[in-house]
């Protein structure tokens, strides 16, 4: 039975470590599906499964636990960054400043509540321990590490602040998710209406394509060419088909418009009214029943060399005699603007003769199998650069310890940048949704299992004996009070969408489990966008403020 003894109890055995993680993750994910009052904790339950196993002595080497924890977190935040990168900067313009101000409010209130409790207990809880509780309450491990480095600079010899962190962390996770749920019921959030509101907000009228059939009624454009009309009108649109005297053809820049001609126009919703008034009037016409010597087809961009090229630079009309009317990216239709940058994974709607469309398909790739091959190089190049950025010390005057973004903040920032600008470096950033979700889920469960196993050994003893319960209570107040206050302000004053607010709360607390819960509630990317919009600034402030408190008050 030596093999069983080694499998169950030998912390240096690879088989034991894999066995332990497999059990903790499987049990946690399974139990996380159980709903209490209609609410389940999802993968967050992996944390508690890890604490339980750690309490009964099932553990692994500390260095291995820390490696798996950090690697899991890196995978999670990097995949989040890749997913939201294309929309990160635009979301910042459309309300990101408001979200970041609200996140700063949460950080400031967390500190205010922590210092208030420190003075309330009048020395019973030492300041370093309260900082440890603060970081557990906001589930921020890099901040805890930075605080420990500051204490080393101050030659601190007191109790390990990680105990306060361990006591506050579990209820910190529960408190953050609980606050999200509480806000939903306090403000009677209608999830269906929030989804519809989100779709309305995300439908950017400048990019969303609008299709209509128009009849030429303006005598001033009769006899003018398509290019002349475009230049005079000053609006961007695509005329993919024209019906003249009962015959349908594909127009080019030299096609002349005549009174009574019927046109199929694709433009942005923003430009549609002006184009309609200028050309004539909108009519009902079934183009499928006309003598149409052409086909319309969605073609998939799969060739890496197309990645990063603008639609106009491809010269589809002049070289192949086809028109591109719209581009579908990640389920959203975009107007075929000549300046639109094509990316691998885009679906391009092409209208033209059968043989011409086939030639365009060959140019773009249109091979679904290519998209099934993961772009491993981009992922690991991004992680490499992210760790490099996260390890870069940022010195501030008067601060003995340089600040760092850490192993979570660095990869997230780099992933966002790669997701947005990777095409300029000829990096293919497309990843199938299933592959992205798989990597994210693996990352988050490894992170949670590691934290739980590591904290489980001393957790019960710390809670039952000494001031453990006090630490738990303080941490819970630090977690909940700021979230409820800022949540109320966000909903009542700023009218923030509930799903975006979920991401804001998770990101301001740098809490991946809360984001994982939010992603289970909705199929939209709003929580992930909200999370990544506030995460970089929140992470920076979390790391900075703990060190500043200790250096200023000790």
UniProtKB/Swiss-Prot annotation:
Keywords: Cell membrane, Membrane, Repeat, Transmembrane, Transmembrane helix, Transport
UniProt similarity note: Belongs to the AAE transporter (TC 2.A.81) family.
MF (Gene Ontology): monoatomic cation transmembrane transporter activity
Source species, domain of life: Bacteria
Keyword presence, Transport: yes
Protein name: Uncharacterized transporter BT_2092
Gene Ontology biological process terms, A to Z: potassium ion transport
Membrane topology term: Multi-pass membrane protein
Subcellular location: Cell membrane
Record-annotated membrane-spanning stretches: 13-31, 36-58, 73-92, 99-121, 161-183, 376-395, 405-422, 442-464, 468-490
InterPro entries for the chain: AAE_transporter, RCK_C, RCK_C_sf, YidE_YbjL
CC annotations in GO: plasma membrane
Record-linked Pfam families: Asp-Al_Ex, TrkA_C
Start and end residues of each RCK C-terminal domain: 199-281, 282-366
């Amino acid at each position: 039975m030596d093999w069983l003894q080694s499998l169950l109890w030998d912390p240096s055995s690879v088989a034991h470590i894999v066995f332990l993680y497999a059990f903790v993750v499987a049990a946690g994910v399974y139990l996380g599906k159980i709903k209490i009052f209609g609410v389940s904790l999802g993968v967050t339950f992996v944390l508690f499964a890890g604490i339980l196993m750690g309490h009964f002595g099932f553990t692994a080497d500390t260095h291995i636990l820390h490696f798996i924890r950090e690697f899991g977190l890196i995978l999670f935040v990097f995949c989040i960054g890749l997913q939201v990168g294309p929309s990160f900067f635009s979301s910042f313009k459309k309300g990101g400043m408001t979200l970041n101000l609200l996140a700063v409010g949460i950080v400031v209130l967390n500190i205010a509540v922590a210092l208030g409790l420190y003075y309330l207990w009048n020395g019973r809880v030492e300041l370093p321990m309260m900082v440890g509780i603060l970081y557990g309450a906001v589930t921020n491990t890099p901040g805890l590490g930075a605080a420990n480095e500051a204490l080393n600079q101050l030659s601190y010899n007191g109790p390990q602040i990680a105990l306060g962190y361990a006591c506050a962390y579990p209820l910190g996770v529960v408190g953050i998710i609980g606050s999200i749920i509480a806000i939903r019921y306090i403000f009677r959030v209608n999830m269906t209406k929030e989804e519809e509101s989100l779709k309305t907000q995300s439908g950017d009228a400048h990019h969303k394509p609008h299709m209509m059939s128009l009849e030429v009624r303006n005598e001033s454009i009769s006899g003018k060419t398509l290019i002349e009309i475009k230049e005079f009108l000053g609006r961007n649109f695509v005329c993919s088909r024209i019906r003249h005297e009962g015959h349908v053809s594909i127009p080019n820049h030299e096609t002349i418009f005549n009174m009574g001609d019927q046109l199929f126009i694709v433009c942005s919703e923003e430009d549609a009214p002006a184009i309609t008034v200028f050309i004539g009037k909108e009519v009902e016409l079934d183009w499928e029943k006309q003598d149409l010597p052409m086909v319309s087809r969605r073609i998939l961009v799969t060739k890496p060399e197309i990645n990063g090229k603008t639609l106009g630079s491809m010269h589809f009309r002049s070289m192949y005699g086809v028109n591109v009317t719209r581009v579908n990216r990640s389920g959203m239709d975009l107007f075929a603007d000549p300046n639109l940058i094509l990316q691998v994974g885009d679906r391009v709607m092409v209208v033209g003769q059968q043989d011409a469309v086939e030639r365009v398909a060959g140019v773009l790739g249109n091979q679904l199998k290519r998209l099934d091959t993961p772009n491993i190089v981009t992922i690991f190049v991004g992680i490499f650069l992210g760790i490099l950025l996260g390890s870069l010390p940022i010195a501030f005057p008067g601060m003995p310890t340089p600040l760092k973004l850490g192993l979570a903040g660095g990869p997230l920032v780099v992933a966002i940048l790669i997701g947005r600008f990777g095409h300029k470096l000829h990096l293919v950033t497309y990843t199938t949704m299933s592959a992205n979700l798989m990597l994210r889920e693996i990352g988050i469960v490894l992170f949670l299992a590691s934290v739980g196993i590591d904290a489980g050994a001393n957790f019960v003893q710390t809670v039952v004996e000494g001031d453990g319960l006090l630490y738990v209570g303080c941490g819970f107040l630090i977690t909940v009070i700021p979230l409820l206050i800022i949540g109320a302000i966000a909903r009542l004053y700023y009218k923030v969408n509930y799903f975006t607010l979920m991401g804001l709360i998770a990101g301001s607390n740098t809490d991946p489990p809360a984001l994982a819960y939010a992603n289970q509630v909705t199929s939209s990317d709003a929580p992930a966008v909200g999370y990544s919009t506030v995460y970089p600034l929140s992470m920076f402030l979390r790391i900075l403020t703990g060190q500043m408190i200790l250096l200023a008050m000790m």
